[in-house]
Amino acid sequence: MSRFMTKRLPVRHDTVAPDGADVRELLRVERGNMAHFELAPGQISVAEAHHTVDEIWYFVRGRGEMWRKLGDQEEVVPVDPGVCITIPVGTHFQWRSFGYEPLAAIGVDMPPWPGGGEAYSVDGKWEPTVESGPG
């Protein structure tokens, strides 16, 4: 049996993230996993933070903003295709989509996403327009 894996981006989302974004699961290995996250045009995510998972996101479609806060450091950055950001464990974050197309990013979780209870809701920068999912 091969240890190599290959997968095409699913047409439909697999689940809804705790922040309310659609999630298309990609691949998972022992020390990390990758997924595609998408917010519909004009949507604002639920603000959240993670107990144990660091993330790196690379935006591939749309435009919007990402808010991050960790301790006394806080910032809002514009995001669009080509922008890459980190979300260290414990960071409060929220994102929103502008324009006429979805805002989408490829995200890497380290360690792999453990499932329910990893994400927890926090006070955000904006009023969310989506509902939290199970993750």
Model regions and ranges:
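A short, N-terminal "cap"/entry segment at the start of jelly-roll beta-barrel domains
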Residues: 1-36, 46-47, 117-135
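Intrinsic-disorder/low-complexity, polar/charged segments enriched in Ser/Thr/Lys/Arg/Asp/Glu/Gln
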Residues: 21, 32-34, 44, 54, ...
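Short histidine-centered beta-strand/loop micro-motifs
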Residues: 24-28, 37, 45-51, 68, ...
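Short hydrophobic/aromatic-rich beta-strand segments that constitute the beta-sheet cores
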Residues: 36, 66-68, 105, 115
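Short, conserved beta-strand element in jelly-roll/cupin
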Residues: 38-40, 51-66
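Histidine-centered metal-chelating micro-motifs
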Residues: 44-46, 65, 83-85, 89-95
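Short acidic-glycine-tyrosine-enriched beta hairpin
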Residues: 71-89
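Ligand-binding loop in jelly-roll beta-barrel domains
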Residues: 80-81, 89-116
